[in-house]
C-alpha cells in the first residue's frame, strides 16, 4: 500500500519563482512532509558584485517561512559547468544551436539533484514544471501540461520511466493564471514575480556579449547560395537557421533570413522570404535519442507519432526509425520550416511525451542542407 502523505517526504526544487512556490504550497496543503531546496548552478555575480541567485534564494526563504517548511541551498556549480555549460559552448563551436534547458534537466535537476533528494530520505522530488505524470496502468508516463501555452515536456524529453517514478509535478494540471491566483490568495512573496525568460546563466545580459567572453567570434561574409555578397556577419555562432533580425541587410522586397552556414569557409548564407524553400526540410538524423519507456516501438522497426522541433511549435506527423543505440532517422509527413541542428526533437502520441533527441543533420529531397 502507498504511504500516507504525512509519511511521504517530498523535496521541492525551488527557484524563487511563482511556479515552484505554488508546487511547495500545494504539497504542504496535501499533508506531505515537504522540504524546499534551492539549487545554485551558476555563479552570476556581476561586475558590481550583485548576484541574482542571492535575490532568488531570499525569495525561497520568504516563501518557505510563509508555508512553514524547512529550506536549504545546495551547490551544483561544478556539475553544471561540466555537464551543461561545456556542452553549450561545444555545440556553439560546432555551429549548432544548443538547448541547455534540456541538458540541465537531464544531468542536473533529475539526476544530480534527484540523487541528492533521495539521499535526504525523500520519496519524491517535485518541481514547478508544467507537465504531468500518469501512474494509472502500471507504467509511468509523462503527459503534457494541461496549460498548452506553458507545457514544458519539450524540455523534459530525456527523462526515463525510472526517474519519473520518483517525480511529482504538482502544478501540471493547472493553468498558469490559476497558479498566480493560488500564490496571490496565499499571500506568497513570489505571487507577482515575473517569470524568468531565456537561458538561466545569461539572464538579462546581452547574448552576444556573454558568448564572446567564452568563445572568440570570427566575423565573415554573408552571401546568397549563388555567392552574391550581402554584407558581413559577426560570427556564425550568433545566428540560427530561420533568423531574421540582426542581419542588417537593407533594400526593398521581402525580408532576409538565415538559410545556411558553412563552418569551414565561415560563410553565413542568407535569402529572402519567410517561406523560402531553403528553409524547409523533410528529414533529420537525431542523436542522444532516449525514450521514457523502453518498449515504445512494440517490436516494430518504425514508430509513427508526432514531433516538435522547437518549443511551443505545432506538432508535426513523423516516422521514427532507430539507426543505432541512441541514433534515429526522423522522416516528416510534410516539410517543416527552420529545423535547427542542436535543438531538441521531441516525440508525442496524443497527450503522452514519448521521449526525444538532438537534431543532428537536416535533409531535403535526399540532400543534406547547409545548416551547419
Curated annotation (Swiss-Prot):
Cysteines paired by S-S bonds: 104-200
Source taxon at top rank: Bacteria
Chief location: cytoplasm
Designated gene of the protein: mnmA
Residues marked Interaction with tRNA (site): 129, 343
Membership in a protein family: Belongs to the MnmA/TRMU family.
EC number: 2.8.1.13
Keyword rRNA processing assigned: no
Chain segments carrying region Interaction with target base in tRNA: 99-101
One example of a Gene Ontology biological process annotation: tRNA wobble position uridine thiolation
GO function term, MF aspect, one: ATP binding
Magnesium is among the record's keywords: no
Region (Interaction with tRNA): 150-152, 310-311
Keywords for this protein: ATP-binding, Cytoplasm, Disulfide bond, Nucleotide-binding, RNA-binding, Transferase, tRNA processing, tRNA-binding
Descriptive protein name: tRNA-specific 2-thiouridylase MnmA
A GO-annotated cellular component: cytoplasm
Catalytic activity: S-sulfanyl-L-cysteinyl-[protein] + uridine(34) in tRNA + AH2 + ATP = 2-thiouridine(34) in tRNA + L-cysteinyl-[protein] + A + AMP + diphosphate + H(+)
Cell location: Cytoplasm
Organism: Bacillus licheniformis (strain ATCC 14580 / DSM 13 / JCM 2505 / CCUG 7422 / NBRC 12200 / NCIMB 9375 / NCTC 10341 / NRRL NRS-1264 / Gibson 46)
PANTHER family to which the protein is assigned, alphabetical: MITOCHONDRIAL TRNA-SPECIFIC 2-THIOURIDYLASE 1, TRNA 5-METHYLAMINOMETHYL-2-THIOURIDYLATE -METHYLTRANSFERASE
Amino acid at each position: 500500500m502507498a504511504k500516507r502523505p504525512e509519511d511521504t517526504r517530498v523535496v521541492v526544487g525551488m527557484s524563487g519563482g511563482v511556479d515552484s512556490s505554488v508546487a511547495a504550497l500545494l504539497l504542504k496543503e496535501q499533508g506531505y512532509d515537504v522540504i524546499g531546496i534551492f539549487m545554485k548552478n551558476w555563479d552570476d555575480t556581476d561586475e558590481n558584485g550583485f548576484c541574482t541567485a542571492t535575490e532568488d534564494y531570499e525569495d525561497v526563504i520568504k516563501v518557505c517561512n510563509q508555508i512553514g517548511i524547512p529550506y536549504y541551498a545546495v551547490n551544483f556549480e561544478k556539475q553544471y559547468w561540466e555537464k551543461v555549460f561545456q556542452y553549450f559552448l561545444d555545440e556553439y563551436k560546432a555551429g549548432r544551436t544548443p538547448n541547455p534547458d534540456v541538458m540541465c534537466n537531464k544531468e542536473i535537476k533529475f539526476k544530480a539533484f534527484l540523487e541528492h533528494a533521495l539521499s535526504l530520505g525523500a520519496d519524491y522530488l517535485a518541481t514547478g514544471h508544467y507537465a504531468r505524470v500518469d501512474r494509472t496502468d502500471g507504467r509511468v508516463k509523462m503527459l503534457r501540461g494541461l496549460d498548452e501555452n506553458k507545457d514544458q515536456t519539450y524540455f523534459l524529453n530525456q527523462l526515463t520511466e525510472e526517474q519519473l517514478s520518483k517525480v511529482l509535478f504538482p502544478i501540471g494540471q493547472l493553468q498558469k493564471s490559476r497558479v498566480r491566483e493560488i500564490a496571490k490568495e496565499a499571500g506568497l512573496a513570489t505571487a507577482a514575480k515575473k517569470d524568468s525568460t531565456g537561458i538561466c546563466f545569461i539572464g538579462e545580459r546581452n547574448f552576444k556579449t556573454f558568448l564572446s567572453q567564452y568563445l572568440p567570434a570570427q566575423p565573415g561574409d554573408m552571401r546568397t547560395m549563388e555567392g552574391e555578397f550581402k554584407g558581413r556577419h559577426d560570427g556564425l555562432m550568433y545566428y540560427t537557421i530561420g533568423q531574421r533580425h540582426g542581419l542588417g541587410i537593407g533594400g526593398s522586397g521581402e525580408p532576409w533570413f538565415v538559410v545556411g552556414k558553412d563552418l569551414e569557409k565561415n560563410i553565413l548564407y542568407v535569402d529572402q522570404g519567410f517561406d523560402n524553400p531553403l528553409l524547409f526540410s523533410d528529414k533529420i538524423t537525431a542523436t542522444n535519442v532516449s525514450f521514457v519507456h523502453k518498449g515504445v516501438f512494440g517490436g516494430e522497426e518504425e514508430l509513427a507519432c508526432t514531433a516538435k522541433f522547437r518549443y511551443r511549435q505545432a506538432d508535426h506527423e513523423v516516422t521514427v526509425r532507430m539507426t543505432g543505440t541512441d541514433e534515429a532517422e526522423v522522416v516528416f509527413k510534410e516539410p517543416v520550416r527552420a529545423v535547427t541542428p542542436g535543438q531538441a526533437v521531441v516525440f508525442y502520441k496524443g497527450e503522452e511525451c514519448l521521449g526525444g533527441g538532438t537534431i543532428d543533420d537536416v535533409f531535403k529531397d535526399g540532400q543534406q542542407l547547409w545548416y551547419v
